[in-house]
Structure formats: structure tokens, C-alpha cells
From Swiss-Prot:
GO terms for biological process: calcium ion transmembrane transport; intracellular calcium ion homeostasis; transmembrane transport. Belongs to the cation transport ATPase (P-type) (TC 3.A.3) family. Type V subfamily. The keyword Nucleus does not apply. The chain crosses the membrane at residues 20-41, 48-70, 194-216, 221-238, 392-412, 426-447, 896-915, 923-940, 959-982, 1004-1026, 1041-1060, 1076-1096. Pfam families: Cation_ATPase, Cation_ATPase_N, E1-E2_ATPase, P5-ATPase. Coiled coil: none annotated. Mg(2+) binds at residues 838, 842. The active site is at 480 (4-aspartylphosphate intermediate). GO terms for cellular component: endoplasmic reticulum; endoplasmic reticulum membrane; Golgi apparatus; Golgi membrane; membrane. The gene is cta5. Plays a role in regulating calcium and manganese homeostasis responsible for cell cycle progression. The keyword Lyase does not apply. It catalyses: ATP + H2O = ADP + phosphate + H(+). This is Cation-transporting ATPase 5.
Amino acid sequence: MDSIELKQLVPENDSEPGTPRQLLFQHYDISNEETIGIKPFKSIPAKVYILRVTEILTLGLLHLILTWLPEFRLKWIEAPCSNEDVEFVAISDPSGTSSIEKVSSICLKNDIQTSSFVLPSGKTRYFEYKKLRFYLEPLNLQWVLMPLETSAYSLVTSTPAYIQNGLDTFTIAKLRQVYGSNSLVSTKKSIVTILLNEVLHPFYLFQAVSVLIWLCDSFVFYSCCIVFISSYSIFLSVKESKESENRIHSIIGAPQPVTVIRNQVKQTVLADDLVIGDLLYFSNLDLKTCPVDGILFSSSCLLDESMVTGESVPARKFPLEDNSLDSWMIASCNIFSPHLIHAGTKFLKIDSTPSTPCLISVVRTGFRSNKGQLIRNLLYPNLRPSQLYLDSMSFLKTMAILSFVSIVFIAIYLNLYNASFGHVVLRSLDVLTILVPPALPATLSVGIANSIARLSRALIYTTSPESIHNAGCLSTFVFDKTGTLTENSVQLSCVYVKSGSNGLLKQVDADSLSLDSTKLNAHAYRVATCSQSLELVGNELVGDPLEVTLFTQFNGTFCATIRASNTPHPPLFSVSNSFDGPSQIFSIYKALEFDPVLRRMSVICSTSTERSLMLFTKGAPESILAISSQQSIPSNVQEVIHTLSSKGFRIIAFASKNLITPLQELIHLSRSTLESNVTFQGLFVLESPLRESSKDVISSLLRSKMEVSICSGDSLFTSVFVAKHCGALDSCNFIYTAELADSGDDCPQIHFEKIDLQTQNFQPIPDGFSLKDVILEKDSSLCMDGKLLQRLLTMLSFNEIKILLSKLRVLARMSPFDKATYVELCQKYGCKVGFCGDGANDCIALKQADVGVSLSDSEACAAASFVSKKKSIKDVFNVLLEGRCSLILSHRCFQYMVLCAIVQFSGVFFLYLKNYNFNDNQFLFMDLLIIFPLSAAMSYFDPAQNLTSNRPNSTLFGKGRVKDLGIQSVLIWLSHGLLTLILHELNWVELPEWQLEKSNTKNVLVTSIFLLSSLQYLGICIGINQSSEFLSPIWKKKTYVCLCTTIGLCNIYLCFANENHIISRCLQITRLPTLYRFIILFMGVISCCLTSILNM
């Protein structure tokens, strides 16, 4: 549910004219994952007029800047106010992103009554934010989203004969005005709009200004090349944006016709015309996608919910029979509700008859539906800038400050020599374009782009490119167990049933079930075949893999169900088994779906001969034992469960109960009443084999000093067994298992067991042993269930929880929300966390993690950072390697671009002192034939083959990097200064005199600094790109080696080439003394050596 928190802010100067007495800041929770802050503002007319005049005088430049920085527009022309006078609202989210939305008005023809407030007829103010409309509630002056679920409930309960009549035309028109339609249409941007958005980006505008400066300085050819490269880059960006937009619209799809009951008749309308409270009519002829979130009112149906929940197993939905508000809210707000049908889910089967059609009441439409939320996430992704990007922007600001200091110095210096004003401006701006490389942030994404390409070729797709850098600095990785570390397939190992003589459990192997059914009692067959989730779609059996295994192992058969029109509660489906024979048919009347909290599922059925009702239930042993009568529980059950769990088996307990209450009354009884005082019957023992690659991946992560944890919904000892056999516990000698003992005290009683991993034996626990003893003991790890973890979080101190997290290796009985909570907890304590799951119950944790690797490709798993099409756990290894590779390449590209800018700035600085400059072809040679190819080749290094214990630094300013950059910058300046000094002191040649209006571009000093700079560009590249444990060996990258060799030979050739050679004439290289040429070459080699030493 949405929630609101209001904060009253008192202005500092309450007597200031025009200042309201109270300022209202509103904190609003749109959902559990989306929170915004809303602050109202109003315009100051005089300041608005001044700003518009200024925007005109600056030819729109100021308007463009304020478009990039909307918060500055607010500060200049808007004043904070109360919601009574609001004209604009400033929206902020926890990531720091802000936006300004205009407040509009709508004229309501009638009052709109909701459960918590009333929107009166007349003028009502609202604003739209990311496809959601917020209304100003007039009584408390609060911004609110319309409460769809409660409003839909009011419509259903207040409409006379709702099931027969549906909504009337008047109500539909009133609802559409306020709640909006069911449209998910997002206006497609034209190519021109996308192009303008790209061109008006600060990066390309800076490029455009730079090109104008270069053209004024007669660098025509160089400018044309930059324009061509930038145009191609813009083309690629526009193409990518358009393709992304088309992908989103393909998910939305075209509006489909649906049947709806309105004004007492069935009508066919487009799905876009639906409103909350509408009554949809579906039949088996309408096996299509549901366009809204709705509550099922009659009949039952089988759905493919993979798009919304990520669950690959089809889900059966049942009608909501309890019409209370509490039941309605639980059904409509719980994503796993058995009565809720999500928008975007596909009907596989509808069990409807003319007397009981499939009727669905609409509770959420448009972007408020679950599919709408998915589309909103795609349209407005939560783009948190990486630390690397933020660091590069900070460094750009530093470079900008340095450039302005240099501009002032150059301007003063040139004025001393009576240079013209135009020449001073041109040289000053030229310094700015050299020292502040606008492509610096873009170079950080080159390594990411190459990593994405390599991952795509390996069938690993990313939905969050910025997460690749996060993958390079993970410290903790969490794995789901079932379907991730183990195979999806489940095999029945054996069955334990009660012995007739003494009531103890006895074992029956799975191989003998089909040979001699008398070894088992009838309940094992009946529970196994009377399944809750199985369906026969066509000729294919679909459902939970565990139930499919039990059904087929016990020779279950689906039977045709005869639905009598006069039967008030027809069966959902019917089955038979080999024990009772084909003549004994079991009809399932009610299915209590698997509940992750209760950890069990049940069915109510009857036989075709006795017609007596029975309840069969199965689930986690502790869950079934908790509802079983004490006299039915064998005395050796705990011993058997403990032994089997320690061997890694998955245990499902089952029980039964004879029901004497009539069916029409049973249907309305609560689950807790039905599932009570059952008779315990036995245990199904199953096993899921480990994936072949699980142990290799886990071992590699542990060798790289990464913390590895396993989260599972299975029992504690089963999870520990899997963790041990996949190598997750190899780094410790002992493990402690901790379980919460039943106790009514506020302080929980914890039962510990100590296991020696070398001998596989249980060790004695001393008296008075506590959790703090485990925390303090070295070489040990801790395993516990989710229930105990939640209790401990409320009891332990900050430091104790931190140590606890470092020792936790296995977490059992974890619900989907428990997994996400554990990931969030690790992040809270400073860990970068990765999570790998199969998508079924892991969507929340996958989204919460810094890096989520999904082994499912359903649409719901778009929340994961990476999706494996091969569904292989080895892809975790590939993602981590690519993350480290892209991170180190981004560091190197950043360092290279910065040092190249300093080399070029240092060179032109010493040339400007004589009013000299590089010529057009020299700039072109340095930038496009040396810097650009080398920076591109640098970014194409492949990742290393193995993970190492070291991790690359996530920040650009760590481990003395700034100090190294500073030292290298000083060395560059000293080398250029020394070269200039040598030329002056030796007096080998006479330099041209100062020219007032034009810089000299052909003389010995220009040639010398050009040759030295060219050598330094190559030397810096070689010095930076040394062997790294995160990258493949340099010699394997033949393109890079060949390019460096070619550029090096070209530079040596230029040092000694005759000035009359065609290349020398093209680059305007003048004649140099031979010794001086050797000095230049020597200084270039020394620069390379010093750079290499500093980067070791």
C-alpha cells in the first residue's frame, strides 16, 4: 500500500513578505521499492520575466543549461510554498535524481468517493510523474495516488447485482476521468526528437563549440574529421535509442478486444477502454493475455505468470469466495495470491461452463498494474551513476579549474606582447578545448561496451550495463540452492511410511514402488497423485517439478471431469492411481496452494465410490508435524528426518484427514481450521543432483577470497549437505548449525550443533554455549534458518551483526523476501553483493543485489543485471571476469586520456610562450593516428581466465592513483621545458620572431615538441598497459602489439626523416641537428620507462 509522511517546515524569516507560514514537504512511498519526496513551489512573476529576457539575450543557451540543471531554475524563479498555492512540484528520489513537474487542473463533474478521502466536484489539481497521476487531496492538502484496490472493492460491493449487471455507463465515464484508462501507450519519439536530445547533450555541444574554435584557428581538416566521427557516434546513439524504444513497445503490444459485462449485457471493447471495477468475461475460446490486474470471481483457470513473477511453473487461480475487505486487500496486493490475475499473464486453460463463466473484476489498470510497473521500470530505469563516472566528472571539474587558471595566465602573457584581443580569446579557448577532454566520461564506457559484446556472444545478456563495473568489485556472492546449485529435476529416492505393527517409520525404495504397491499404504499413493499444482494442458503434464515427479512415480492418471450444471461446487479435476485402481476416481474440490510462510500445500477431495471427503497435505516436515495429532507421529520420525537431511535429501512429509463437514460448508472454512489435527502418514524422500559446474564455480570464488553464502527454502541440514558438497564450506574446519527452539520467552532459545567437516561427526557442545561463542571462535562457520536470523537482527549490536554476517555460510527456510532482506543487510554493512538464482522465487533478491545473475529468461527477471540464456551457473564466473576486466580497462583509459591531454596542453603551453602552435596536420596525426587508435586498442583486451584474490579498485582516486598522475604530469612538463631549454641554450638554430596576429606553425621548436609528444603518447600507452592479473597477456592481443610497433616505427622514422620527404612536408617537419634528434628519442624512451615504473 502507498504511504505518506508529512514534514512541516518553518521558514527562517517568518516576517518576510510573501513567505507562507508553513512549508510542506511530503515523503511518499509509491511502493516498497520506490520512494519520492515532493516539495511544492510557486513562480515569482518578476523573476520569470527577467529569466525569459535573459534566455533570449543568450540565444537560448541559458535555457539549455537550465534544462540540464532544473534545480537551478527552481532557485532562480520559484519560491517554496504550501500546497494551497502550488504551481510546480520538485520530485526527488533516494538516488539523488530530481525532476520538476507542472501542476495542472481537472474539472470533475461529480464527487469521487474513496475509502480515505473525497475529491469534490469542480477544480482539482494534479501532476503526473513517470506515468502516475497524483491528486491534491483537498481536506489535508496531501498529494495522493488514487487507492485502486479499495475503490474497486467499493464498486463491487455497492453495485446492485454486480455479477449480472457490471458497471453502468455513467460510472465508467466518472471513473475514466479520474483513474484514467487502461492504456500502456508511451508516445514514440520521432527520429528528429531523439536526434535533438543527442545533439543537445553537453558532450556534443562542447564538441560543437570546440569545432568552431578550431575552424577560427584554421584547423579545417582536423575539424571535419572530428565532425564526421561525432556524427557517426550520434547516429549509433539514435539507432540504439530507437531500438530500445521499439523493444519496449513490443512488450506493451497492441490493444486486444475483450468481453466485458456492462449495463447488464456482454460487450466487446478494446482493453484500453477498461476501468477499475469492470467485469471481464473469459471462456476457453478466449485463451489470450489478461490486460489488467483482476480478482477472479468465478470458475478457475491456469495461467503462465512468468512475465510478472518469474515463476516458470503455471499457476492455478481460484475464485475469491470471502467478500470481506481484508480478504479483498490480501488477494489484490499479494503478488502470489491464488485469486489475483496479473496483467500480462497468459491463459493456458479456463475451467468454465455456461453456468459458471470465468469472471474477473478489474482492480488495477494501466501503469498501476503489475505489467505497467514493469513497463515503467523499462521506461524510467533507476540509473545510479557508477563511482567511476562520478570520479571522472570530479576530475573534469579539477581540469576545468586548471584550464581557467591557464587561460588567465595565457591572456596576461599574450597581452604583454600586445597581441590582439581576438588572438588572445582564440588562444585562451584553445587551451580549454585541450585541457578538458569532453570524451573523458565516454571513454569509461568503452570497456563496458566491449564486455557487453563478449557476454552477448556467450549468451549472457545485460539489462543494466553499469552493473558490469559493480561485478568487478564484488566481495560477497549469494546463491539460491534449488535450480541454481542443483538441477531443476527432482528424483524420488524412497518413501517412509508407518509400520502397521509398532507405528515406526519404515523405508520403501523408489524402485520397488511399481513392483509391489502393497509395501505402501494407500495414503502415499493418494497424496502423491492428488496434486495441488498439476494440470493437463493438451497432452502435457505441467506443474511443480516435485509434484510431477511424485505423480508419475506413483502412476497417477488424469481423468475426464464431468461437471453437472446443478452441482454448486464442481470438482476442479479428477485423478486415479495404480493402488486404488482405475475405477476409484479422486475428485479435487479445493486446492490450498503452497504458502512460502506455512511451507505446505493441501487438497480436499472425495472418492467416486465412498463420496466421503478427505484432506491430503504435504510440505516441510516441521510444518506437517506442527499440525499433526501427537498420537499419529512415529517416535523415530525426528531421527529419520535428521539422518536424511544430513545426507542432503529433500524431505516432504505428508498427512491426511477425514472430513465430516459437508462440502458447501468446507469451502468457506479457513485454512487454519482445515489444516489442523491431521494424521501423519509418512515422508517422501527426494534428491536433486548438483549441477556439474557448481563445485568448480564455488571453489573458484573461494580461492579469490570472496565470501560465498547459500540461501535455500529447504531444511537446514539438507542445505548444509549441499553447501558442503559444492565446496561452500571448504574454507572452514567446523560449522555450527543454529535453530530456534520453541520458547515463549522474549529471549529466544537457540539449539546448536557442531559438525567436524573432516570426520563428518557431531561434536559435543559445552554447557552455556551461546551465539557469542560462535562469533568469537576462529575457523568456524555458522548455518541457520531465516526465522532465527530475523530474531537476531533485533537483539545483536552493530558490530556483532557484522561479525555474524562474515560467518554465515548457509541460510535455510528462506522465503523470497528473506533472501532480499539478507542481501540488503550485507549491503548495509559495506559489502558489494552478487546474487544468482533461477528466477522462480528470487526476483526480489536479484533486483536488490548489486549484481544479479538470473538463470531464467522470463520478463520478470529483467530486474536481474544479467540473464543467462544457457541457464548455466558458469556464467557467474564469466560475469565476474568481465566485470574486473571492464573496471581495469576503464581505469587505464581514464589515465591515458588525462595524460594525453596534459601532454598536449604542456606542448602548446610552451609553444604559446613564443606564439607558436601545432599545425592542422600535426593535431590530426596526434589525435586521430596515435591517441584514438591506441585508446581503442587498449579497450579491446580480453579478461583473464581465472579469478584472483585481488580485486580492482572501484574508484579512480584510490591507492595513490592521484599521486601517480601528479608525478607523471610534472615529468611531462619538465620534459617539454627541458627540451625547450636545451634548444635555447645550445643555439643550434635561430627561432622565428614573435608574430602579433598569427601563430607560427613551422619551426624547430614546434617540430621538436611535436616529435616528443608523439613519442610520449606511445610511451604512456605502453607504460600504462602492463601485464595485469585481470587481463589476458599482452602478447595475445596481436592488434595492440602490431599497432604499438607500427606507431613506434613511424615515430622513429619521423625523428630521422629528411625534411623534404612527402610525410615531413605534410607535417611541416623542419630540419633538426642529428644529436638533437637522438636527444628527443632518448627523452621519449625515458618518459616511457618512468611511466612504466610508476604504474607497476
